[in-house]
């Protein structure tokens, strides 16, 4: 009996990990790509922490495509994508004073034990659009959005129009700064009132203005900025408060609520946090919390980074503001995977700076837990000040709880329950097909520009297309007399669809929407010579042999392997691939040396010794640090590795004495582009 219990426990753990990954990937897409998150920051962060904890305890289930190794993206098609010189990370979070105190105590303790504690800086967390400013010889060279943390959109010309961004500074220095572009509450309401399609909140308006193509238009809007961090400077700085003093002298705008606490009195720090929270509604701009940072740059260097956030900083998130509204309808949505999501439509209500008209209800269990139905008056919050959420029933005006139908709202097939969620398993379900076509056309897959979600729904409902493949056979000239389809738009659509034929095999494979098969897992397959449709489909004909081979590949778990095998025995998917093959699509990936995960270097402290044929040491240092590693000039016990070339010096002997790992160029070639 005991054996069975252990087996079931392990199976439950594996299922929980897979479920968490599914949810987090979905939430990442909703937040960073669709701009319509369905869960709160708190729910997201708890899920991410739970996944990190499980992967730490059960490393055998950790895969290279885990969302714990990645973070989201705000990249757009309209602006050039540029690689950041340094990783632009997120922040660790605390949701109550107790968590915040524990973090402060930890920083004080670690800093004091190392003799490098100088204090804590506290500043408001501005709810705006993140920007990175690059100065060379004292002149603004470029301004990039955060993007996915490694690559951002170049919005330099638009940022130049913001009056509080210095175009040049008095000293010929190099600087890389982080800031937050925002628009005041008053200006948000004034401008939003004049727009045909108003924005949900001030942050979205600021982001929308910043991404306008015409810089003259941007200049006509009152965007503003607070600078809050130095990522790099060509002059020496030892503390955050020294850095802020220097930035003020250069003419940068620093938030007036930024305050430095040099002592170890925790009460002083938390009182200032509470003061900012109390004054939140009276501020002229939106904030959603405060950020605490270790003041000493030396201590920051010692504490280091995770792949997600610096260990020397934390964001304390304020509780969301709430409003009261009435539920006028509950609709049920069907996702690409068949997952059923109930959504509440509510009477328009202004909550935390934005008008709310709908909110996700997650699943039937959630609805039952608060006893919700159409007609009820409910409390609505913007969790994390972003996501609309129904918190509770304030006034019960209906009978009982809303019940999701046992049949799919689209195809009417009986739903099945997996965990807390209902699913439609009909592969021919119209709603599922529409969502799959949207995914196929998305930037991350086939990048068919101009085919919006509404356009795809229109084409499907008019029976012009019934799957992805019909995008390539449909005569788009038939749309020319329809409203919204002029000749220019149709030509652009045809060109974009034609261009998609040249997308690499890995993008086409991703676009098939195979469950659990994400971009990184596809690169794992390719790196293990499963790099073409013919190779994978031939392998999967023998299911047992395919499973055995796939499970030998690091980063491929049983569930992913079974999903791949099932997909490559699915007539619908095989027919699609064969269609694309006949159309001349690339069904083979010729480059089989993709870097799947460069987090190996991220946050690692390294030093360098010796000479390297064909490579200058300065260039090597630059390339490695661009991957998130931290360069140290001397070998110390805190070093993670020493890069060793020909004729190494005494640094090698010291590293060996301290037990520090030593690497050659061969050891890092998979993580750093040494050829360019």
From Swiss-Prot:
Its EC number is 6.5.1.2. NAD(+) binds at residues 41-45, 90-91, 123, 146, 180, 293, 317. The keyword Ligase applies. One of its GO terms (molecular function) is metal ion binding. Keywords: DNA damage, DNA repair, DNA replication, Ligase, Magnesium, Manganese, Metal-binding, NAD, Zinc. Zn(2+) binds at residues 408, 411, 424, 429. Coiled coil: none annotated. It is an enzyme of class 6 (ligase). This is DNA ligase. SUPFAM superfamilies: BRCT domain, DNA ligase/mRNA capping enzyme, catalytic domain, Nucleic acid-binding proteins, RuvA domain 2-like. Gene3D superfamilies: 5' to 3' exonuclease, C-terminal subdomain, BRCT domain, DNA ligase/mRNA capping enzyme, Helix hairpin bin, Nucleic acid-binding proteins. GO terms for biological process: DNA repair; DNA replication. Its cofactor is Mg(2+); Mn(2+). Belongs to the NAD-dependent DNA ligase family. LigA subfamily. It catalyses: NAD(+) + (deoxyribonucleotide)n-3'-hydroxyl + 5'-phospho-(deoxyribonucleotide)m = (deoxyribonucleotide)n+m + AMP + beta-nicotinamide D-nucleotide. The active site is at 125 (n6-amp-lysine intermediate). DNA ligase that catalyzes the formation of phosphodiester linkages between 5'-phosphoryl and 3'-hydroxyl groups in double-stranded DNA using NAD as a coenzyme and as the energy source for the reaction. It is essential for DNA replication and repair of damaged DNA. The gene is ligA.
